[in-house]
Amino acid sequence: MSRRHRAVKREILPDPKFGDVVITRFMNALMYDGKKSTAEGIVYGALEVMRRRGGTTADPVAMFHSALDNVKPAVEVRSRRVGGATYQVPVEVRAERRQALAIRWLIDASRKRGENTMQERLSNELMDAVNNRGSAVKKREDTHRMAEANKAFSHYRW
């Protein structure tokens, strides 16, 4: 057993434009090599594109949260060794990890898209996620399908 203490969670400040902590988390995940202003520009630009596309009443922050909620997984499978055999055991995902996975999947799906700028790719992936389609939503569906297929091993949960 490890004798180390658990690392203290750092407080994340809300983003300057919308005052939202989740958007800051998203920017931090998107950021490469500490280039926060570049990540900020991409996220704010993508949200602006979403606002323009959604009409005058569209709230980009609400759309962002809706997209994130549509990508969050409820269950996932974790490997568990029992008597020489490895079972994929479905377990419920903690709220914190749920958010982290959704953010990671949205960014990965955006990076794999074919549009020219990251801003376009991100806004299109977010719009797809709002409408329950796109690669990130497919990833969540696949995860849920795996958990459903391995439901028989759920008694191995720890």
Curated annotation (Swiss-Prot):
One of its GO terms (cellular component) is small ribosomal subunit. It holds the Pfam family Ribosomal_S7. It comes from the Bacteria. InterPro entries: Ribosomal_uS7 (IPR000235), Ribosomal_uS7_bac/org-type (IPR005717), Ribosomal_uS7_CS (IPR020606), Ribosomal_uS7_dom (IPR023798), Ribosomal_uS7_dom_sf (IPR036823). GO terms for molecular function: rRNA binding; structural constituent of ribosome; tRNA binding. GO terms for biological process: translation. Keywords: Ribonucleoprotein, Ribosomal protein, RNA-binding, rRNA-binding, tRNA-binding. Part of the 30S ribosomal subunit. Contacts proteins S9 and S11. NCBIfam families: rpsG_bact. Belongs to the universal ribosomal protein uS7 family. One of the primary rRNA binding proteins, it binds directly to 16S rRNA where it nucleates assembly of the head domain of the 30S subunit. Is located at the subunit interface close to the decoding center, probably blocks exit of the E-site tRNA. PANTHER family: RIBOSOMAL PROTEIN S7. This is Small ribosomal subunit protein uS7.
